[in-house]
Amino acid sequence: MIRGTSLSTSSRSIKVFIFNARYSSNYVKAPIKKMSYNSAFQKSYYSNPASKNGMTNNSATTSSPKPISNNESESSSSSSTIKSFSDSPAIASSPEVGSPINWSDSFHGLGTAPFPKEVSDILLASIDNDDIEIKPDGLLYLPEIKYRRILNRAFGPGGWGLAPRTESLITPKQISREYALICHGRLVSVARGEQDYFGGDEKITTALEGCKSNALMRCCKDLGIASELWDPSFIRKWKKDFCDEIFAEHVTTKKKKKLWKLKKNKTLDYPYKKI
């Protein structure tokens, strides 16, 4: 539909046509296509002010979609694989003077004074070569019960303990939790223990104990217990004197690989046998 109106003045005559055409025959309304979210574009746009200034006023007034932060995307993707027991230690809201120390967040006594000489001599004593073990991959370690015996000799049974600092973080294959080592009422060290597990949720309970033992071993490192096991020179010499690296075969898959063992042990643990 087209409408026209003619207007004249003293100087000249001007014909003005006012067009009011709603959709002409050659115009087809196309459906609105929903654009896919481009996180890379939005990230560069919101981090580069120059890209904002180059926009026109019309485009600047339109609302832009809010970018998704990295924390939100990571938390949404990992929430399906990471679990927690929600067993965070209770935190006192208003601690009072003289009240028991809350070891979940306290650092009471950390680094205040050294322990007596008789205690230090026990902690820093050289470990017996017969107490050291080696894993098939060549890693030296001291059995967890040895650490507990050294702590009992140094501080006495009941004179030390492990206090949890965080909740247990559980993934499909690993458990971790932070612990604090308390000796004679003082915080000595904080470490996060970890333990891999296989076989489903029924193995979590055993893995939790392994996680606690791993944290104890790491805390004892700050006290100097079995510090030789962290010394590369000692490790090389001890392996040369007390260990052998031999070829072994898996009894079922028949795959061959090199493994470490103690010289005093004549055989390998299942499922490997000496070639």
UniProtKB/Swiss-Prot annotation:
GO terms for cellular component: mitochondrial chromosome. It is found in: Mitochondrion matrix, Mitochondrion nucleoid. Its main location: mitochondrion. Residues 51-62 have a biased composition (Polar residues). The keyword Mitochondrion applies. Coiled coil: none annotated. InterPro entries: Mgm101. It comes from the Eukaryota. Residues 63-88 have a biased composition (Low complexity). Keywords: DNA damage, DNA repair, DNA-binding, Mitochondrion, Mitochondrion nucleoid, Transit peptide. Pfam families: Mgm101p (PF06420). Residues 1-23 form a transit peptide. Residues 51-93 are annotated as: Disordered. GO terms for molecular function: single-stranded DNA binding. GO terms for biological process: interstrand cross-link repair; mitochondrial genome maintenance; recombinational repair. Performs an essential function in the repair of oxidatively damaged mtDNA that is required for the maintenance of the mitochondrial genome. Binds to DNA. Belongs to the MGM101 family. This is Mitochondrial genome maintenance protein MGM101. It comes from Debaryomyces hansenii (strain ATCC 36239 / CBS 767 / BCRC 21394 / JCM 1990 / NBRC 0083 / IGC 2968) (Yeast).
